[in-house]
Amino acid sequence: MPNAQIPVLKKNRTKKRTSRKIAILLILLFIVLLAVLFFRSSLSRVSEIRFDGNVFSTRDQLLNRSGLAVGDQYFGVSSSDISEKLREIQSIQQVTVDKQFPGIIAIHIKEFATVAYELQSDGSLRAILANGTSVSVGSSGIAVEKPILTKWRSDDPYKAKLCDALSRIPGEWTADISEIIPAPIPSFPDRIKMYTRSQFEVITTVSLLNSKISYLNQVLETEDPGLITMLEADSYVPFKPDTSEEGQEKDTTQ
């Protein structure tokens, strides 16, 4: 009778379920075994660390700050942690970490732009970055089109503001500025004096520099060397010729 076959069907179903469980367990064990073998193999380790874009920080400095080393667990490396650690270096503005399987960590460094150089008491120059950080020039070389800051105190609050202002001005507009020195007065505590390679003398303030730079370049391009004042009002006065030199020239022509 049909009812006599029901126990047999239940036994078959039980066997099938047991077989499936065993198969699943075997698959899981196989996956675990593969994972153990993988994490013990060289494929799971950092095999190469690359840096690019760094000028003021050496490879050793970046490695020490990041804590990275060849042989570290590749999947244990946190891109956000590395970026955060490297951005603690004052010359670094942005960090991008690119993990390339298997084993390669490529780190792209963006440093703050150099806006000026500073003359030290021993005659050496240090690069001044857009955030006001002073760094050793080293083997990176000097960009001759950048101004030199002289007579600035290290704790002068207007120095960092000046660097920020310079970073916002196109490089071709500051290329003629050769030197910037502080020249504060009671009414203008952030007053500065600038000298240009084209023999102009410029008086302005840190806070006005960005808004006055277009006027400055207009005068530099169209006028003879002279004194340019860019404060509440703008003015230009050409330098008077040296009468003594003119007299000497006349004597030699007679």
From Swiss-Prot:
One of its GO terms (cellular component) is plasma membrane. Residues 44-112 form the POTRA domain. Disulfide bonds: none annotated. Residues 1-21 are cytoplasmic. Residues 43-254 are extracellular. It is found in: Cell membrane. Keywords: Cell cycle, Cell division, Cell membrane, Membrane, Transmembrane, Transmembrane helix. It holds the Pfam family POTRA_1. The chain crosses the membrane at residues 22-42. The keyword Cell cycle applies. It is a single-pass type II membrane protein. GO terms for biological process: FtsZ-dependent cytokinesis. Belongs to the FtsQ/DivIB family. DivIB subfamily. Cell division protein that may be involved in stabilizing or promoting the assembly of the division complex. This is Cell division protein DivIB. It comes from Paenibacillus polymyxa (strain E681). The gene is divIB.
